[in-house]
């Protein structure tokens, strides 16, 4: 198979391949970029594999960075772009089920492609656009299959994160998991506990917000992977609702909010759950706000102060979450009500703490409490947002 019209991300890198070829070495585009080219998906960057050793690449190109030279990777800076170029290699000994203990450089592309995770990622393309396919990756692309290269169990023992990558690719590409590969995940799911939470989280989020997440999540549950991640052990019955949803979350915050709701976590358990997954403080706050506002609109209509405290981003996220869960909510009415608020943040209020101090309010906690009272009064339409009305409100109430 030959590709004649390459997108710019490839044509810009062709001179790099040509220079390596002209120096007497083989060089190919490899991996996800070739897969995405064949699927007409957006390509972020390209990876290059070569028979040249790292020191030979450094002799060919003037500007290089030793990004992973021990494992055969050199970054080449060329025409304002950076390209990761990795020597053909084989790997052996995976005591931590993630990184190889030994890397051996080889001169054969086929040997290099053997170590890759799935057949659709074991494709290569030469400088003329010819596709090299030693493991029927093209056939699996046509069949929409995620299949491990060679024996699936071996691939997962080499890198247990590949089991999460399998369900992630299922979700992103809306492919099916090949039965033997699925069985190997079921047989080896315990190995996932050897992998850092951060890496598992990244794959889980990519799976959860992609268009095929319902089917992928079902496999995530059926194979036992869900038993090896923070907070999910023994919760299969709760999580089984996810594959039945009509829509997938499209943001990371809504994915976590959805998990919290399905798991029926009380509000005081949310911080611990989010930290178990090594989420940032900012993500933790964002998710807690969405869950709190979802609980609020599920019980009663929000007033102006509720909308003010939530903010537009949380309101929109919560509307999306309600749609995912099939809960009736008048989203446009909520947004319209928010847009009609007399103030939307602290800066919109014509006075601040300094104004209160100047008007005889003693410094201390009372200043903050009074500011909140004033905001509520403005939001509820009791007073106008001007200094005269606020001054009168203070004199009458304090």
Swiss-Prot record:
Mg(2+) binds at residues 45, 47. CDD domains: NT_ClassII-CCAase (cd05398). The keyword Protein biosynthesis does not apply. It comes from the Bacteria. It catalyses: a tRNA precursor + 2 CTP + ATP = a tRNA with a 3' CCA end + 3 diphosphate; a tRNA with a 3' CCA end + 2 CTP + ATP = a tRNA with a 3' CCACCA end + 3 diphosphate. It is an enzyme of class 2 (transferase). CTP binds at residues 32, 35, 116, 159, 162, 165, 168. It holds the Pfam family tRNA_NucTran2_2. Keywords: ATP-binding, Magnesium, Metal-binding, Nucleotide-binding, Nucleotidyltransferase, RNA repair, RNA-binding, Transferase, tRNA processing. One of its GO terms (molecular function) is CCA tRNA nucleotidyltransferase activity. GO terms for biological process: RNA repair; tRNA 3'-terminal CCA addition. SUPFAM superfamilies: Nucleotidyltransferase, Poly A polymerase C-terminal region-like. The keyword Oxidoreductase does not apply. ATP binds at residues 32, 35, 116, 159, 162, 165, 168. Its cofactor is Mg(2+). Its EC number is 2.7.7.72. Catalyzes the addition and repair of the essential 3'-terminal CCA sequence in tRNAs without using a nucleic acid template. Adds these three nucleotides in the order of C, C, and A to the tRNA nucleotide-73, using CTP and ATP as substrates and producing inorganic pyrophosphate. tRNA 3'-terminal CCA addition is required both for tRNA processing and repair. Also involved in tRNA surveillance by mediating tandem CCA addition to generate a CCACCA at the 3' terminus of unstable tRNAs. While stable tRNAs receive only 3'-terminal CCA, unstable tRNAs are marked with CCACCA and rapidly degraded. A single active site specifically recognizes both ATP and CTP and is responsible for their addition. Homodimer. This is CCA-adding enzyme. It comes from Lactobacillus johnsonii (strain CNCM I-12250 / La1 / NCC 533). The lineage of its organism: Bacteria, Bacillati, Bacillota, Bacilli, Lactobacillales. The gene is cca.
């Amino acid at each position: 198979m030959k590709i004649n019209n390459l997108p710019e991300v490839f044509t810009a890198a062709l001179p790099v391949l040509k220079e390596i070829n002209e120096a007497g070495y083989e060089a190919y585009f490899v991996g996800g970029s070739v897969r995405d080219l064949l699927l007409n998906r957006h390509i972020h960057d390209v990876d290059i594999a070569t028979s040249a050793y790292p020191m030979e690449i450094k002799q060919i190109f003037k500007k290089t960075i030793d990004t992973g030279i021990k494992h055969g990777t050199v970054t080449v800076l060329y025409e304002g772009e950076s390209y990761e170029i990795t020597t053909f290699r084989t790997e052996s000994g995976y005591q931590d089920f993630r990184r190889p203990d030994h890397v051996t450089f080889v001169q054969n592309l086929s040997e290099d492609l053997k170590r890759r995770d799935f057949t659709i990622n074991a494709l290569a393309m030469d400088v003329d656009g010819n596709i090299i396919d030693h493991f029927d990756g093209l056939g699996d692309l046509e069949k929409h299959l995620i299949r491990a290269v060679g024996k699936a169990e071996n691939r997962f023992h080499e890198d247990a994160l590949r089991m999460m990558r399998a369900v992630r690719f299922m979700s992103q590409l809306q492919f099916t998991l090949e039965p033997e590969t699925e069985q190997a995940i079921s047989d080896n799911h315990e190995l996932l506990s050897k992998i850092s939470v951060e890496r598992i989280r990244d794959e889980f989020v990519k799976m959860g917000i992609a268009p095929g997440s319902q089917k992928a999540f079902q496999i995530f549950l059926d194979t036992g992977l869900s038993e090896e991640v923070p907070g999910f052990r023994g919760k299969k019955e709760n999580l089984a609702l996810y594959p039945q949803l009509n829509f997938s979350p499209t943001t990371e915050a809504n994915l976590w909010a959805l998990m919290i709701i399905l798991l029926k976590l009380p509000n005081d358990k949310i911080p611990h759950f989010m930290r178990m997954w090594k989420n940032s403080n900012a993500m933790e706050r964002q998710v807690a706000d969405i869950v709190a506002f979802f609980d609020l609109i599920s019980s009663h209509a929000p007033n102006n102060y509720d909308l003010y405290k939530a903010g537009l981003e949380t309101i929109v996220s919560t509307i999306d979450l309600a749609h995912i869960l099939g809960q009736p909510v008048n989203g446009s009415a909520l947004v319209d009500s928010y847009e009609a608020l007399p103030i939307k943040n602290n800066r919109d209020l014509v006075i601040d703490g300094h104004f209160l101090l100047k008007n005889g309010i003693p410094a201390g906690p009372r200043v903050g409490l009074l500011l909140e009272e004033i905001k509520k009064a403005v939001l509820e339409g009791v007073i106008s947002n001007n200094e005269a009305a606020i001054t009168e409100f203070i004199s009458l109430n304090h």
